[in-house]
């Protein structure tokens, strides 16, 4: 059937089209069926129907489909599409039947090419969440994800990389680790994410200083020029299947374990990483609650890395309270720059950054065994890491002269005060993140929270224990009300409760 295009300028995150009910009946297409659209290109899309949004003879297309037909002024041919082979692969996985490598590859290709509906994707995600995957299947999934998008091939090796499992607010260490590694002569092209449920991913933070959206080729050029890069992975077309899976995982609030392994390692494989250090924060409100679970995750990452030809080391790190004392893009960037400028900053930030950078320096041969942390600290003290950070900022289109004093934070503030003398005995990471998000982070770069008291520290009644920053007054009010209701930082005196004797004094 020949239909003229009508563009709906809306991005919905998938290939979807609208058919008039009359045209759909003639084609034999029901809502949720696939169709093949042929014009300048040939693509598949999921059909929906309407009796009034598009007239007969017209095909309504959303932006993701329209991108394939920009400036195409002729009718397109629309025909029913055959059922994807991946549907039967997903059915096998749901039935706990073994699959082969070619089936996994077909599945990933169909995900990237938008040949699967969200229902089918949800079935795949739920199946792997419930039934798990074998080591072979995880390796095949990872390799297919690498091959599905752009890859970077460097002429110089080794290539270093670092990844944090997440779940800890204020984890800004990449802003220190990357320049430390690059300042010691190793290449580290760090592709990072934006925050999905957090108050600021590394890409959100770096965007305070310079652009972060670059093609894979540009990432290679920046890295080869200055030794390192801190960019948003979503702009590179590296492992694009991952973004499409995340789109479905998010509303389900699940992150299947084996898909998480594949997602992490696919991004490392796509940039050609030889040596990778994994930061696994452990604590009650992190993604990895116990040391035992952290050790299992470490073993699985190391094993998968070995299968893919990567050397992986893991660091189990303390995750019960934030890294540093600031949460939110501009606040965190200011804190990180102060460390680079003068070593002035929280010990938790300096120690963790130096420890992880030290492991990478040893893995890359830039430091003898057990001296990596010492060399990382010296790189910070000497100003070499700061100079390298300035080079990275400039290479990515930012101002290399920017300092911590130049970083602007939200103009609206409110303090949470200690209700009694005592000590901080409880710290809820999840509510700290939520309060920062309600204040506007990460979209409002100046929003977030400053933490004045951490676990075990003493306080006096009326001392500020938390300051909320916002760029908009109504967001400050919402964040403040939530902080007062949830009490994310609990203060108690040394005497928790007095229990009187039954018989009184004699």
Swiss-Prot record:
Q: What is its EC number?
A: 2.4.2.57
Gene3D superfamilies recorded for this chain?
A: 1.20.970.50, 2.40.40.20, Nucleoside phosphorylase/phosphoribosyltransferase catalytic domain, Pyrimidine nucleoside phosphorylase-like, C-terminal domain
What GO biological process terms does the UniProt entry carry, in alphabetical order?
Answer: AMP catabolic process; pyrimidine deoxyribonucleoside metabolic process; pyrimidine nucleobase metabolic process
Ordered alphabetically, the record's keywords are: Glycosyltransferase, Transferase
Q: InterPro entries in the record, alphabetically? A: AMP_phosphorylase, Asp_de-COase-like_dom_sf, Glycosyl_Trfase_fam3, Glycosyl_Trfase_fam3_N_dom, Glycosyl_Trfase_fam3_N_dom_sf, Nuc_phospho_transferase, PYNP-like_C_sf, PYNP_C
Report TM segments: none
Catalyzed chemical reaction(s)? AMP + phosphate = alpha-D-ribose 1,5-bisphosphate + adenine; CMP + phosphate = cytosine + alpha-D-ribose 1,5-bisphosphate; UMP + phosphate = alpha-D-ribose 1,5-bisphosphate + uracil
Q: Where is the active site?
A: 255
**Single GO molecular function:** AMP binding
Respond yes or no to whether keyword Plastid is given for this record.
Answer: no
Task: State where AMP binds.
Answer: 167, 193-198, 202, 263, 287
Whether Glycosyltransferase counts among this entry's keywords is yes
* GO cellular component: a single term: cytosol
Per the entry, what this protein does is: Catalyzes the conversion of AMP and phosphate to adenine and ribose 1,5-bisphosphate (R15P). Exhibits phosphorylase activity toward CMP and UMP in addition to AMP. Functions in an archaeal AMP degradation pathway, together with R15P isomerase and RubisCO.
The family classification in the record reads:
Belongs to the thymidine/pyrimidine-nucleoside phosphorylase family. Type 2 subfamily.
Q: Which NCBIfam families match?
A: AMP_phos (TIGR03327), ARCH_P_rylase (TIGR02645), PRK04350.1 (NF003338)
HAMAP family hit by this protein: AMP_phosphorylase (MF_02132)
Name of this chain's protein: AMP phosphorylase
């Amino acid at each position: 059937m020949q239909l003229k295009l009508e563009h709906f300028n809306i991005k919905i995150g998938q290939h979807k089209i609208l058919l008039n009910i009359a045209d759909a009946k003639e084609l034999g297409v029901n809502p949720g069926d696939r169709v093949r659209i042929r014009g300048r290109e040939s693509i598949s899309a999921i059909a929906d129907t309407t009796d009034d949004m598009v007239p007969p003879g017209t095909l309504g297309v959303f932006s993701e489909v329209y991108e394939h037909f920009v400036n195409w002024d002729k009718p397109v041919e629309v025909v029913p599409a055959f059922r994807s082979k991946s549907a039967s692969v997903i059915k096998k996985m749901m039935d706990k039947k073994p699959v082969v490598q070619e089936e996994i590859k077909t599945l990933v290709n169909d995900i990237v090419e938008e040949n699967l509906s969200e229902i089918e994707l949800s079935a795949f995600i739920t199946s792997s969440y419930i039934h798990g995957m074998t080591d072979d299947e995880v390796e095949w999934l990872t390799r297919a994800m690498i091959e599905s998008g752009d890859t970077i091939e460097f002429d110089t090796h080794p290539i270093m990389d670092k990844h944090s499992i997440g779940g800890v607010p204020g984890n800004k260490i990449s802003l220190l680790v990357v320049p430390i590694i690059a300042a010691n002569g190793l290449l580290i092209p760090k592709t990072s994410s934006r925050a999905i449920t957090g108050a600021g991913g590394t890409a959100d933070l770096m965007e305070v200083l310079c652009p972060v959206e670059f093609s894979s080729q540009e990432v290679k050029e920046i890295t080869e020029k200055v030794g390192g890069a801190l960019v948003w992975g979503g702009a590179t077309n590296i492992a694009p299947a991952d973004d499409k899976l995340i789109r479905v995982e998010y509303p389900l609030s699940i992150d299947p374990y084996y898909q998480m392994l594949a997602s992490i390692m696919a991004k490392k494989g796509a940039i050609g990483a030889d040596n990778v250090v994994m930061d696994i924060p452990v604590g009650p409100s992190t993604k990895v609650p116990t040391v035992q679970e952290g050790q299992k995750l470490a073993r699985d990452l190391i094993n998968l890395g070995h299968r893919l030809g990567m050397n992986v080391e893991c660091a189990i790190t303390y995750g019960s309270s934030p890294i540093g004392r600031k949460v939110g893009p501009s606040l965190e960037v200011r804190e990180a720059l102060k460390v680079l400028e003068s070593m002035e900053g929280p010990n938790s930030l300096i120690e963790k950054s130096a420890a992880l950078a030290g492991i990478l320096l040893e893995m890359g041969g830039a430091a003898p065994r057990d001296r990596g942390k010492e060399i990382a600290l010296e790189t910070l003290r000497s100003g070499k890491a700061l100079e390298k950070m300035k080079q990275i900022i400039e290479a990515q289109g930012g101002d290399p002269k920017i300092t911590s004093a130049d970083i602007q934070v939200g103009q609206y503030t409110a303090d949470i005060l200690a209700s009694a003398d005592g000590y901080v005995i409880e710290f809820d990471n999840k509510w700290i993140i939520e309060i920062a998000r309600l204040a506007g982070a990460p979209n409002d770069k100046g929003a977030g929270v400053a933490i004045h008291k951490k676990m075990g520290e003493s306080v006096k009644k009326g001392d500020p224990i938390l300051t909320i920053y916002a760029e908009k007054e109504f967001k400050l009010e919402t964040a403040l009300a939530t902080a007062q209701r949830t009490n994310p930082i609990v203060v108690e005196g040394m005497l928790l409760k007095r229990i009187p004797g039954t018989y009184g004094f004699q």
